[in-house]
Amino acid sequence: MSTISKEYGGALFLAAKEEDNASDGYLKQVFDAVMLCSRLFKENPLYVSFLKTPDIPLEDRLAAVHDALNGRVPEYVDNFIELLTERGYIDRFSECADEFKLLYYAENGIAEAEVVSAVPLTDGEVHALRTKLKKITGKRIELLFEIDPSVIGGLIVRVDGRVIDASVRKDLDNLRELMGKTAH
């Protein structure tokens, strides 16, 4: 992550947090809007290209942003997009959003867990996993799922800098390694 993204994402977080002290819930509103805009920019890279195009006058680009957002995001997010556009950093919005998310999660005792499995988990398995990870980390858990058939069975979980590999693939790799050592 670039220094610019850390500075801008951090500044937005601090400003929203300060405003949250005055109006309860504002930080959460800003977080939700930043995540939404980040997802929109990732899914529609033409938006970012449009906002970066120097051939279109800045006023027209900003007017288009204001029209598109039309009061649907908190003022701080609208102003943040405007600032990044004016300074030519709008292509770093997603990185800024990542920094904002890190700070928001730290502030609210949330850990993000990446879960890799061969097949989708059932609701019961998701609940049990979330409960177990909460017990391990002491934090509220946000789960991100990835399906990878090469896992074969079980799970690989990355949370708080730790990797928990309880996959069948790992067991087979360990067995293969053990068999290779005993064959020599």
What are these regions (language model features)?
Residues 1-184:
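Elongated, mostly alpha-helical coiled-coil "stalk/stator" tethers of large membrane protein machines
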